[in-house]
């Protein structure tokens, strides 16, 4: 897994001065381009003009649940039957940890370029949301926020052992959302993740979208825009507020 060929991420530059970054990770079988239209949706009200969006592309790997055929994926999936047990059973730990290292490297590169960690949000959808949640909570720096859409906690049975001490993101706001008609990542797995994280003391907000399957909806995208605007306010706005005091 360490020698995987990776394409550079799709970059959507900030419209104004770059002061914050969002790393948004696609799901199984997709590419970063699959979420480019969502980025435009989030930017349409010009509230995120200072934000650069990074949309990574997963490498093409054999997926066991796809009869071993290659497709874009962040880790192998052994079965897709909609059950919580199937996704938690026999997880591809090596693949998960390889992708985790990749996302931690993306975060570090943003920090090295001058973006503070607390001006970085990481998240994604489905497999990408699972990687965003896992990578964010195990990061060795305090992030601005984490987004997990239609996803779940990876390596949940040993997760506590993998979190660095101190826990930099214990209080970091986590935006979780899930459709209650999801046939791929069962809604129960989403609520189990929410409950487990809350039991461990994490700052989770979970929204249910009635009737939604394994997808996103406009209402959900608007909620994400609000979350990003709250977590990554314009630096110019902050400066203006200080000057008025």
Swiss-Prot record:
Subcellular location: Cytoplasm; Nucleus
One GO CC term, this protein: cytoplasm
EC number: 3.1.2.-, 3.1.2.22
GO MF terms held by the record: carboxylic ester hydrolase activity; palmitoyl-(protein) hydrolase activity
InterPro entries hit by this protein: AB_hydrolase_fold, LYPA1-2/EST-like, PLipase/COase/thioEstase
Keyword rRNA processing: no
Keywords: Cytoplasm, Fatty acid metabolism, Hydrolase, Lipid metabolism, Nucleus, Serine esterase
Enzyme class, broadest EC rank: hydrolase
Predominant cellular place of this UniProt entry's protein: cytoplasm
Catalytic residues, chain numbering: 126 (charge relay system), 182 (charge relay system), 214 (charge relay system)
Name of one Pfam family that matches: Abhydrolase_2
Family statement drawn from the similarity comment of this UniProt entry: Belongs to the AB hydrolase superfamily. AB hydrolase 2 family.
PANTHER family assigned to the protein according to its UniProt record, in alphabetical order: LYSOPHOSPHOLIPASE-LIKE PROTEIN 1 (PTHR10655:SF17), LYSOPHOSPHOLIPASE-RELATED (PTHR10655)
Purpose: Hydrolyzes fatty acids from S-acylated cysteine residues in proteins with a strong preference for palmitoylated G-alpha proteins over other acyl substrates. Mediates the deacylation of G-alpha proteins such as GPA1 in vivo, but has weak or no activity toward palmitoylated Ras proteins. Has weak lysophospholipase activity in vitro; however such activity may not exist in vivo.
Protein name: Acyl-protein thioesterase 1
């Amino acid at each position: 897994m360490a020698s995987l060929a990776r394409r550079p991420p799709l970059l959507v530059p900030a419209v104004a001065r770059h002061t914050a970054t969002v790393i948004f990770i696609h799901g199984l079988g997709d590419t970063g381009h699959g979420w480019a239209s969502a980025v435009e949706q989030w930017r349409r009200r010009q509230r995120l003009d200072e934000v650069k969006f990074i949309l990574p592309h997963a490498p093409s790997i054999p997926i066991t649940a796809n009869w071993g055929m290659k497709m874009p994926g962040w880790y192998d999936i052994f079965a897709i039957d909609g059950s919580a047990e199937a996704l938690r059973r026999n997880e591809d730990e090596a693949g998960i940890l390889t992708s985790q290292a990749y996302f931690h490297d993306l975060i570090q590169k943003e920090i090295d370029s001058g973006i503070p960690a607390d001006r970085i949000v990481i998240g994604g959808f489905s497999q990408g949301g699972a990687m965003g949640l896992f990578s964010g909570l195990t990061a060795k720096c305090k992030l601005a926020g984490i987004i997990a859409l239609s996803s779940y906690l990876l390596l949940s049975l040993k997760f506590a052992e993998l979190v660095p001490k101190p826990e930099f993101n214990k209080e970091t706001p986590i935006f979780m959302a899930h459709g209650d008609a999801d046939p791929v990542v069962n809604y129960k797995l989403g609520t189990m993740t929410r409950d487990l994280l809350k039991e461990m003391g994490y700052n989770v907000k979970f929204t249910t979208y009635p009737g939604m399957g394994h997808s996103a909806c406009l209402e959900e995208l608007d909620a994400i825009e609000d979350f990003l605007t709250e977590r990554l306010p314009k630096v110019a706005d902050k400066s203006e507020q200080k000057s008025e005091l």
